[in-house]
């Protein structure tokens, strides 16, 4: 065990346009090589095009999409007596949200590689898919839930 103090959690300031901490976390997930302004442009363009399609505020579309993709349970490997079991465990809220954000970005980039469209268009369509409870990120969430459901018998082996 580490003898140092626990690592402090960083405070994330809300973004300038929508005043949302969740959106700033998403921008930080998208950001590559420290280019935050590029990531902000991508996210804001995707949200503005999503606003035009749904006729709702962009940040509320995004929050609903993240809520739909957020997992409630996941499986963790636990080794007992030479056998490894997949034990279903509840996900902490902070981890669940960060998983949802990563899944949205991952499925949007996979869509970009397949289709060859710009990233913000793929991100927009992935956010709308998550908003409507379909798409790659929602499928990842469903797979986590199914895996936990299949291994429900090992839930007594909790950590």
Curated annotation (Swiss-Prot):
Belongs to the universal ribosomal protein uS7 family. Disulfide bonds: none annotated. The lineage of its organism: Bacteria, Pseudomonadati, Pseudomonadota, Alphaproteobacteria, Rickettsiales. GO terms for molecular function: rRNA binding; structural constituent of ribosome; tRNA binding. Pfam families: Ribosomal_S7. NCBIfam families: rpsG_bact. Keywords: Ribonucleoprotein, Ribosomal protein, RNA-binding, rRNA-binding, tRNA-binding. This is Small ribosomal subunit protein uS7. It comes from Wolbachia sp. subsp. Brugia malayi (strain TRS).
């Amino acid at each position: 065990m580490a003898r140092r103090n626990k690592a402090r959690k960083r405070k994330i300031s809300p973004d300038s346009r929508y005043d949302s901490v969740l959106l700033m976390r998403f921008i930080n997930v998208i950001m590559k090589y420290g280019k935050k302004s590029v990531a902000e442009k991508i996210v804001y363009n995707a949200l503005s095009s999503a606003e035009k399609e749904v006729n709702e505020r962009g940040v509320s579309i995004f929050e609903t999409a993240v809520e739909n993709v957020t997992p409630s349970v996941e499986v963790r490997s636990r080794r007992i007596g030479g056998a490894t079991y997949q034990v279903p465990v509840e996900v902490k809220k902070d981890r669940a949200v960060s998983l949802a954000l990563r899944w949205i970005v991952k499925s949007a980039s996979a869509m970009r590689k397949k289709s060859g469209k710009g990233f913000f268009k793929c991100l927009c369509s992935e956010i709308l898919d998550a908003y409507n409870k379909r798409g790659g990120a929602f499928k990842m969430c469903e797979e986590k839930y199914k895996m936990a459901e299949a291994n429900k018998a090992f839930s007594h082996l909790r950590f």
